[in-house]
């Protein structure tokens, strides 16, 4: 199972750059997690690029209007995806204006990380940390305790 994180624009804030690098490095031993950055722009343009880059994947749009999951739910879904041989799961983080309705309608899940609206670079770091936490739980390593 491969996690693909697709995000609009390159992180420019120092904490985001450091957080992205930290969690991508921590995720490496667990297998394939890939971050792909698409060119930033209007919601319409970014949504088209995100949909094209996630073709063939189970899609999860990161959106403030989405469902709130616990870490345990993410772990349970990851187990289910493994059991059903889902090969690629794409998490889509849009531009600052969010996703289009078309993109949301073409996703398997809509996920919110918080009831707060999160700046998209912060959302990227939080998502990577949760994916790392998910992997440690699945592997039985102590990070999550």
Curated annotation (Swiss-Prot):
Top-rank lineage group of the source organism: Bacteria
- For the ligand (S-adenosyl-L-methionine), the binding residues are 94
Family from the record: Belongs to the RNA methyltransferase RlmH family.
What protein am I looking at?
A: Ribosomal RNA large subunit methyltransferase H
Give the source species.
Akkermansia muciniphila (strain ATCC BAA-835 / DSM 22959 / JCM 33894 / BCRC 81048 / CCUG 64013 / CIP 107961 / Muc)
Which InterPro entries does the record match to this protein?
A: Alpha/beta_knot_MTases, RlmH-like, tRNA_m1G_MTases_N
List GO molecular-function terms, semicolon-separated: rRNA (pseudouridine-N3-)-methyltransferase activity
> Which Gene3D superfamilies does this UniProt record tie to the protein?
3.40.1280.10
Is rRNA processing included in the keywords of this UniProt record?
A: yes
Q: What class of enzyme is it?
A: transferase
Catalytic reaction equation(s): pseudouridine(1915) in 23S rRNA + S-adenosyl-L-methionine = N(3)-methylpseudouridine(1915) in 23S rRNA + S-adenosyl-L-homocysteine + H(+)
Biological role: Specifically methylates the pseudouridine at position 1915 (m3Psi1915) in 23S rRNA.
The places in or outside the cell where this protein is found are: Cytoplasm
Subunit and partners? Homodimer.
Q: Does the keyword Transferase apply?
A: yes
**UniProt keyword terms in alphabetical order:** Cytoplasm, Methyltransferase, rRNA processing, S-adenosyl-L-methionine, Transferase
Per the record, its GO cellular-component terms are: cytoplasm
Instruction: Give the EC number(s) under which this enzyme is classified.
Output: 2.1.1.177
């Amino acid at each position: 199972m491969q996690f693909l994180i697709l995000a609009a624009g390159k992180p420019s804030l120092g904490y985001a750059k450091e957080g992205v690098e930290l969690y991508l490095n921590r995720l490496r031993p667990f297998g394939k997690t890939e971050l792909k950055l698409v060119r930033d722009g209007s919601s319409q343009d970014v949504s088209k690029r995100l949909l094209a880059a996630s073709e063939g994947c189970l899609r999860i749009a990161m959106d403030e209007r989405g469902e709130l999951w616990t870490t345990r739910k993410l772990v349970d879904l990851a187990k289910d995806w493994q059991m059903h041989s889902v090969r690629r799961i794409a998490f889509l983080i849009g531009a600052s204006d969010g996703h289009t309705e078309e993109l949301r309608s073409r996703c398997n899940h809509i996920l919110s990380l918080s009831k707060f609206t999160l700046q998209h670079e912060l959302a990227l770091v939080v998502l990577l940390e949760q994916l790392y936490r998910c992997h440690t739980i699945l592997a039985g390593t102590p990070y999550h305790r």
